[in-house]
Amino acid sequence: MTLIQDITIVTMNPDREIITNGAIRIEGSKIVAIDKSENFPESPASINGGGMVALPGLIDTHAHADQSLLRGLGDQMHWVPFLDKIVDPYLSERSIHHSLLANQLSMIEMIKGGTTCFLSPNADPTDDFNLLSEASSNIGIRAIFCRFTTAKEKTRAWVNNLTDLNQRNNKLVDVWVGLDIPRVQGDTAHPDFYRDVRQVCERLGTGLAYHFCSEFEDSGYMYNCL
């Protein structure tokens, strides 16, 4: 048993209570109790928190974790040419191992900053999801990889792939659908495909992520086209 004392604890209980001069009791890998320090017996395995603040883990709901190696490229560029000139060429040329390294870098940086769970909205279907899952488990961060899925794919193929990926025994990692939708002029909408994807996700009990009105331009396009 380990006891971390002399900390301010920000809780997630119904009252959103903040406990000053608090303590956290840990057994094995689990937090089993939090309370005022004075309410715990002295423990030889005590750690003095030095008045620091203990926060619940943060959740990043939109993290392009596989693009960390592009940092510094395309600064101040509009998002459309950034995709055309930087992101798309990178994705077409990178290897599985480059993707793994990029994701690992993002995971480590997130953990250091207090993020304990993230969602990657457009995970490349050519990535090795077993390697990504192993990396996530080794680093100790929860991950949701949304497999990028387009109307060009045969439904049975991506459904079988999604089913297989979610049958792995990894409690830290889930694989959802990262849906390809139109965002700029020239893109084509596929309403029947979107309905099929929704039905598949409902049947499999899995999640769905997509970009929607994330920029000024595609908000107008969405309004007129969908």
Identify the meaning behind each predicted range.
Residues 7, 24, 29, 51, ...:
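Divalent metal-coordination and catalytic microenvironments
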Residues 1-42, 52-53:
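N-terminal metal-binding scaffold of metallo-dependent hydrolase/deaminase domains
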Residues 77-128, 182-189:
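Divalent metal-binding segments
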Residues 12, 64, 123, 149:
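Flexible loop residues that form catalytic
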Residues 69-101, 140, 214-226:
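Active-site gating loops and adjacent loop-to-helix segments of metal-dependent hydrolytic enzymes
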Residues 127-226:
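Metal-coordinating catalytic core of metallo-dependent amide/deamination hydrolases
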Residues 49, 89, 115, 136, ...:
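Domain-wide signal for the mature, well-folded portions of proteins, strongly enriched
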